[in-house]
Amino acid sequence: MTIDETKKKKMLSYRWLVFIALAIAYFFVYFHRTTGGAISTTLMDYFGVGTASVALLASAYLYAYTLMQIPSGILTDRMGPRKAATIFVALIAVGSLLSAYSATANDFNLMIAGKFIIGIGAAVVYIPIMKVLAVWFRKNEFATMSGILLLVGNVGGIAAATPMVLMMDALGIEMTYIVLAIITALIALLVWLLVRNHPMEKDLPSIEEIVSEETGQPITESTSEKMGTVEALKRTFLSGRNFWPLAIWFFVMYGTIMLWQASQAGAYYKNIGGFDAGTAGMMLTMVGVGMVFGCPLAGKLSDSYLHSRKKVVIIGTVVYTLIWAFIYLTADSADILTNEMIQYVINFCFGFFGGFFVVSYAQIKELYPIAMAGTSTAALNLFPFAGGAILITIAGFLVTDQTLDQYKTVWLMALGLMVLGCICAFLSKEKEHDA
């Protein structure tokens, strides 16, 4: 079958509008995920609460996000990415409004409730985007596009630091969250207007039809196929090496990233390294900057050069593990720990190679039928956030007096877990790609 060239060009152009609308939404997913640390002092002063309450606020988002991972996959496969993303981006706006009202009522519990609602909404954004990438983009573009998406997300994470603090200083807590609610509501409208579940909804050829014409190969799988929820879950969780090595790997990989970036590193630099809060914050910003470069590069390496998901995952995991070894082994060295340049480089490399995790989404997607792309990706995505929640909780019990020995115990735990992560990366499976 010959494809109309005009429709083909329109499809290959329109998909970028779909991606841009969803990427803007994902910017704010990352923004809300990482904003707590930067404004923690402001919140403590305004509401009269302590560090434990602020930690609870951060974990409210995390636990909501984790709990919604499997439902997000089911909702995406059943409702379609367009409706699922629109509804739950709008829910982020609702959570932002509740956060604004918490400042008016001077009720920190309402702020926590607002953060929890934001977490629920944010959880059902990433999986619809993964489904859209699977339907609108070629298979050899998936990892690259995932990397670009994570780049956008990490820019959102960077914006959640100093820019958020400046905005809150200028507008106050209430008006800041009202502005965020309005922006998010407009983004939900943009998603509804631009996103389509499948090219056929705009009378355009599917990506598999385009690829078939380009390669001369017959279509073996349709992006319009659907599968029952129970069947998709069974095929995911009972698939042995297709799923579990990657799941365990992601648990420890992203769990240790969050352990460092979102929990212990700031206090470690302040209490052991002797840095002020501003300098420590700038050092940790380099983790996000590293990911801005590492995520898209990993995707490009996977799609265009190494033609392998697994090799890229292994490279990133091994180097990331070596960075943890460096952190642990040099913790006793005051000359290294107090050297700002070394710590900036370490945090950049930490984020750069840690960001190679993005390729795992392409790896898992290709091991299952396209009809269960949402469910299989959501099942995998359950583990990194569970890893972060659990490891941060464990670290909280281990670091009670904030002594060097206690931090070293946590770093050793992270290093040991990453050795396990390396083993799992080597044991993981991938679909073979043509060079």
Region spans (language model):
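Extracytoplasmic
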Residues: 17-51, 67, 72, 260-266, ...
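Cytoplasmic membrane-interface "Motif A"-like loop-to-helix N-cap segments
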Residues: 78-89, 303-318
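C-terminal ends and interior cores of transmembrane alpha-helices
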Residues: 90-105, 318-336
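Cytoplasmic helix-loop-helix junction between adjacent transmembrane helices
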Residues: 114-152
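Conserved MFS/SLC helix-loop-helix module at the cytosolic interface between two early adjacent transmembrane helices
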Residues: 67-108
